[in-house]
Regions:
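Basic helix-turn-helix/winged-helix DNA-binding cores
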Residues: 1-65
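A short, Lys/Arg-enriched interface patch at domain edges and termini
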Residues: 59-94
Length: 108
């Protein structure tokens, strides 16, 4: 059995702040700043240690790209919220289309 991240478990926090920072090419204090600004919310151990997931790392990479493009933290927060809302609405659209297709197939 392994304690490492499982490929399908991208929400599970497994990386400490130093490793996460190194993996995404940012400084650990930057990760703390982004958390304090509400840009991400890593898991915490019972002792309070931050644990970053694969999804957190992807989000940090997106934050870094937006910063490199000149977007400030307030703008990044707005962009990330809009992306999440877009993903939610897209998933809802797929679900509704599937339901509509199922309803059409079940008609006599």
């Amino acid at each position: 059995m392994t304690d490492g991240p499982r490929p399908h478990d991208s929400d599970r926090g497994v990386y400490g702040i130093s490793v996460a920072a190194e993996l995404v090419g940012l400084a650990a204090p930057s990760l703390r700043l982004y958390e304090s600004q509400g840009l991400l919310e890593p898991d915490r151990t019972p002792g309070g240690t931050r644990r970053y997931s694969i999804n957190d790392l992807e989000r940090l990479r997106a934050i870094a790209e937006l910063l490199d493009a000149g977007v400030n933290l307030t703008g990044i927060a707005m962009i990330l919220r809009l992306r999440e809302e877009n993903e939610r609405l897209t998933a809802e659209g797929h679900r509704l289309r599937a339901e509509r297709g199922e309803a059409r197939r079940s008609r006599p």
